[in-house]
Design a protein with these regions (language model features):
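Short, conserved catalytic or interaction motifs in soluble domains
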Residues: 9, 55, 82, 133, ...
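PLP-dependent aminotransferase-like
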Residues: 19-107, 114
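Alpha-helical elements of the RecA-like P-loop NTPase motor core of helicases
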Residues: 15, 40-41, 90, 155, ...
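Short active-site oxyanion
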Residues: 2-3, 27-28, 143
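Active-site region of PLP-dependent enzymes
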Residues: 110-116, 123-199
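Conserved N-terminal alpha-helix of the aminotransferase class I/II PLP-enzyme fold
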Residues: 1-12, 16
Length: 199
């Protein structure tokens, strides 16, 4: 993808992604019933209600059941790629586009997996990874990463993960050394030690 940013953990990655997409109280987010608690935790922490779709024969989101769960409160879909496999992203993206929904991939258990020669994390609007030691690519403690090709979403996620702050460019083109809090955010950065270990 064009853009990526390190965050504190995979749960934060999902929550930051949801908030960047404008998900909040009164909204619903569709995900699969076969997932770890953090997927649902992120949805609830964003203020939304999780709605579940059953799995297919590969224990991944059954995209054939997806459209029946969509209503006027639905804001996003979180397909969960598991066991090194990718969900049926062609069908999921088609349904999302038809209904004007964001697709946020949960890639915590699919590092390196591909779908039609594209890696997971590059198939939806946003990809969210976890580097917890039990994951396919584990760090030395918690860590997470977010990927996207959308600069607007990337800029918003950069602010959210750093206490809602941004730096302003001066007319000279140089960055002003001061930070400005422009929205609500959190403190969730991938620290240098974990990043260095994973390199």
């Amino acid at each position: 993808t064009k853009y990526g940013l390190g965050v504190g953990n995979g749960t934060d990655a999902l929550e930051i992604a949801l908030k960047a997409c404008g998900v909040g109280p009164g909204d619903e987010v569709i995900t699969t019933s076969n997932t770890a608690v953090p997927t649902v935790t992120a949805i609830v922490n964003a203020g939304a209600k999780p709605c579940f779709v059953d799995v297919d024969e590969f224990y991944l989101m059954n995209s054939n059941l997806l459209e029946n769960k969509i209503n006027n409160k639905t804001k996003a879909i979180i397909p969960v790629h598991l066991y090194g496999q990718s969900c049926n992203m062609k069908n999921i993206n088609k349904i999302a586009k038809k209904n004007n929904l964001y697709v946020i991939e949960d890639c915590a258990q699919s590092h390196g997996a591909t779908y039609n020669n594209k890696t997971t994390g590059s198939l939806g609007d946003i990809g969210c990874f976890s580097f917890y030691p039990t994951k396919i690519l584990g760090g030395y403690g918690d860590g997470g990463f977010i990927t996207t090709n959308n600069q607007k979403l990337f800029d918003k996620m950069m602010r959210i993960r750093f206490l809602g702050m941004e730096r302003k460019k001066m007319s000279s083109g140089h960055w002003n050394g001061k930070y400005y809090a422009v929205e609500h955010g959190t403190n969730s950065r991938l620290d240098e030690v974990h990043a260095a270990i994973m390199l």
